[in-house]
């Protein structure tokens, strides 16, 4: 449906003609706002009707605007609905319904544009001439417009929680705490009963949601501010709003020492902290307080365990065990070891006449025999024949049992590990981490998660990543 340029385009909007939105919902559309001198420019009126049509049927005169509208449809579907009709915003003291027509429509258009200015998915305005004009009725930044500064600022501040909450899944930066906007009872009472009844239920539901969000946000900010890890977060909500495409992002704060309450998340904890905090503490043997003790039996001054005899005197571990088992003092002179059976002088086998054997045995008559002859006789009850005699002693390689193998292998592994720990420097020393943790100081102090604790940064960052402070406009471009 084509409309003449001089005719107001919003007069022929199909939503109004088909009575999808009754006049009682927007009383300003059916009364004294028909004069062309009081109407807004066509571009701003398109924006106004874009938020009126919640069914997704906006009116645009040319296909270029329609294609641009399609790109905003997913985010528009999340932001339309109940939040577009808030009586306490539209009936604020600076924006009455029944006063001048331009102020009311400006507030509605600014009400529509405010989610895009605070959403992380923000793009350039659909109508640059309307949104970018300095001092015009529509302004991207709160309080920048000349005539409706208070109204646009309040609408932007009231919609900040919803927009920031919708984008919190992708950007974990905590949003700026919203300003509480309470409806003015005098101006609200002066409004038409039809409009207040139409949007009253929606406004009450949204007020409850807004109060819940503000309470939860304040509690989370208190928790983060009181945490020893991030004491600097308590002052984040008081930062002034900057003129920026994404005002929910806080201003750039360098990673200073006061932002980190614990050395675990501060780069200085890795770089300048003592290396002993990461090195395994070698347990030094605790010196016992018994340096002056001495064993009354052998005179030893060092022993793994001090014992006492019957009279209370100190004994070393060896003398104490001997006294306990034998009931007498441990002899100081070691007894001479008995010569092994293989070295007995003058002993020979009664069967094969050999003088060397690993073990001397005795036959039934009591005569000494070598190990081979004694075993043969024990098994066969017959003397071992002399033809089986060999010059050398045949021995066999006994296989170690599995238990002894495991114990020996475990001991060897433990020794190797202890040697490696002593020889090599610890892997988490300050010198080893100095090269890897250098770019951490350029990172913003906020993590990309919604939790209280920040996400630990990787120790080995990729060389392709840029650790400079990213400009939010480039991030929005990448999102698009």
Curated annotation (Swiss-Prot):
Zinc finger (GATA-type) residue numbers: 295-319, 349-373
SMART domains: ZnF_GATA
Swiss-Prot/TrEMBL GO biological process terms: angiogenesis; brown fat cell differentiation; cell differentiation in hindbrain; cell fate determination; central nervous system neuron development; central nervous system neuron differentiation; cochlea development; commitment of neuronal cell to specific neuron type in forebrain
Any Gene Ontology CC annotation: nucleoplasm
Keywords: Activator, DNA-binding, Isopeptide bond, Metal-binding, Methylation, Nucleus, Phagocytosis, Phosphoprotein, Repeat, Transcription, Transcription regulation, Ubl conjugation, Zinc, Zinc-finger
Main location: nucleus
Modified residue annotations for Phosphoserine: 73, 192
Residue numbers bearing the Asymmetric dimethylarginine modification: 86
Subcellular location: Nucleus
An example molecular function term from Gene Ontology annotations: C2H2 zinc finger domain binding
Low complexity bias (residue ranges): 183-201
Keyword Ubl conjugation (UniProt): yes
Entry-linked InterPro entries: TF_GATA-2/3, Transcription_factor_GATA, Znf_GATA, Znf_NHR/GATA
Positions of the UniProt region annotated as Disordered: 166-208, 457-480
Domain of life from the UniProt record: Eukaryota
Cross-linked sites for Glycyl lysine isopeptide (Lys-Gly) (interchain with G-Cter in SUMO2): 389
Alphabetical list of Pfam families matching this protein: GATA
SUPFAM superfamilies listed in its UniProt record: Glucocorticoid receptor-like (DNA-binding domain)
Function: Transcriptional activator which regulates endothelin-1 gene expression in endothelial cells. Binds to the consensus sequence 5'-AGATAG-3'.
Subunit composition and interactions: Interacts with BRD3. Interacts with AR and CCAR1. Interacts with MDFIC.
Protein name listed in UniProt: Endothelial transcription factor GATA-2
Species, as recorded: Mus musculus (Mouse)
Gene: Gata2
């Amino acid at each position: 449906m084509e409309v003449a340029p001089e005719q107001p385009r919003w007069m022929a909007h199909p939503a109004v003609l088909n009575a999808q939105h009754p006049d009682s919902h927007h009383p300003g559309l059916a009364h004294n706002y028909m004069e062309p001198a009081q109407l807004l420019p066509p571009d701003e009126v398109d924006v106004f009707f874009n938020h009126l049509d919640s069914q997704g049927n906006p009116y645009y005169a040319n296909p270029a605007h329609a294609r641009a509208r399609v790109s905003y449809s997913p985010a528009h579907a999340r932001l339309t609905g109940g939040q577009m009709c808030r009586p306490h915003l539209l009936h604020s003291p600076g924006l009455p319904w029944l006063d001048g027509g331009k102020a009311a429509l400006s507030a509605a258009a600014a009400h529509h544009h405010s989610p895009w200015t605070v959403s992380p998915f923000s793009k350039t305005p659909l109508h640059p001439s309307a949104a970018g004009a300095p001092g015009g009725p529509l302004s991207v930044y709160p309080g920048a417009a000349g005539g409706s500064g208070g109204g646009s600022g309040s609408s932007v501040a009231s919609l900040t929680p919803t927009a920031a909450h919708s984008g919190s899944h992708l950007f974990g930066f905590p949003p700026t705490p919203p300003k509480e906007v309470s409806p003015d009872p005098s101006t609200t009472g002066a409004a038409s009963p039809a409009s207040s009844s139409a949007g009253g239920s929606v406004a009450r539901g949204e007020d409850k949601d807004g109060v819940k969000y503000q309470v939860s946000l304040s509690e989370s900010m208190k928790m983060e501010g009181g945490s020893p890890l991030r004491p600097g977060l308590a002052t984040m909500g008081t930062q002034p709003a900057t003129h920026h495409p994404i005002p929910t992002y806080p201003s750039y704060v360098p990673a200073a020492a006061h932002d980190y309450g614990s050395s675990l998340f501060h780069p200085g904890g890795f770089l300048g902290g003592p290396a002993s905090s990461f090195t395994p503490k070698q347990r030094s043997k605790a010196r016992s307080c018994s340096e002056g003790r001495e064993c009354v039996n052998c005179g030893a001054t060092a022993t793994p365990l001090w014992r006492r005899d019957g009279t209370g005197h100190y004994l070393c571990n060896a003398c104490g065990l001997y006294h306990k088992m034998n009931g007498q003092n441990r002899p100081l002179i070691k007894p001479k070891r008995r010569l092994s059976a293989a070295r007995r002088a003058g002993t020979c086998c009664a069967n094969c006449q050999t003088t060397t054997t690993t073990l001397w045995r005795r036959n039934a008559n009591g005569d000494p025999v070598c190990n081979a002859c004694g075993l043969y006789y024990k098994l066969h009850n017959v003397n071992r024949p002399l033809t089986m005699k060999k010059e050398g002693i045949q021995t066999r390689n006994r296989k170690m049992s599995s238990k002894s193998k495991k114990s020996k292998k475990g001991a060897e592994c433990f020794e190797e590990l202890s040697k490696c720990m002593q020889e090599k420097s610890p892997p988490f020393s300050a010198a080893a981490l100095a090269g890897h943790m250098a770019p951490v100081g350029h990172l913003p102090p906020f993590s990309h998660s919604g939790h209280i604790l920040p996400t630990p940064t990787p120790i080995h960052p990729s060389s392709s990543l840029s650790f400079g402070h990213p400009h939010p406009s480039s991030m929005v471009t990448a999102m698009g």
